[in-house]
Amino acid sequence: MCKRGDIYSVDFGNNHDSHKQSGIRPAIVVSNNKANANSPVITVVPLSSRVWKRRYLPTHVFIPFKKESGLDRPSIALAEQVEALDKKCLGEKIGEISDETVMEKLTIALQIQIGAYSEYN
């Protein structure tokens, strides 16, 4: 069973004519573990390794390079591109985010994205 904080290889399809992330890339599972265990749908946030080319947004969360993440370099979680997917789109598990502080920052970024903080509206 996949769990919140796991990093999977995900097929985001072909979005070449848009600014959305596309192709096969890592993503962090952000849906709650009860939903992850019981639903055929999972919620993920795509990652980008282009940390130096991205303009900072309050929905971006830096993911440091750590062995347990399974990533080969630092990345940015793009919470503004949060997406619900069929679990069939998940590839292999790459690693996990074990740092609670990073997951807390990602939760806040998701709240900002959905307008939970009036200062960003």
Feature annotation, model-predicted:
Residues 20-24, 29-65:
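Compact nucleic-acid interaction/catalytic patches
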